[in-house]
Amino acid sequence: MTTEWLLTVADALSRLPAPPEEQFVYLLEHGTAKIGLYAPRGVDPQGPHQRDEIYLVWRGQGSFERAGERHPFGPGDLIFVPAGMAHRFVDFDDDFAAWVIFYGPKGGEQPLEDSPG
């Protein structure tokens, strides 16, 4: 069950549009954050977004391309993509699904001057 403060994978999957529609659904919005589930089938058609985003892989594995680099991913992995950066999932399993969180202002957030690292 999904409430306004608890998102379940089962409810998110049941709310995805049927193919051939893009397999994405927003589930929660708060402040600048928009949270959804992304489960592309076959090909990932997305391009750069106007806001920073975080993916948390729920199931499946494959490779992720970001700004010309390609890296493998699997369940539990977290992927960060700054606003405006080209990216996509490639060679992913048929059951791939990831939580996605868009946040911050258009153009992305700037690092804090006093942030560690």
Predicted feature residues:
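A structure-centric signal for secondary-structure junctions around beta-strands
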Residues: T32, R51, D95-F96
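Short, conserved beta-strand element in jelly-roll/cupin
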Residues: H49-F64
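A short, N-terminal "cap"/entry segment at the start of jelly-roll beta-barrel domains
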Residues: M1-L37, G42-G47, D114-G117
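Short strand-coil-strand connectors
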Residues: G31, E65-E69, F92
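Short acidic-glycine-tyrosine-enriched beta hairpin
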Residues: G68-A83
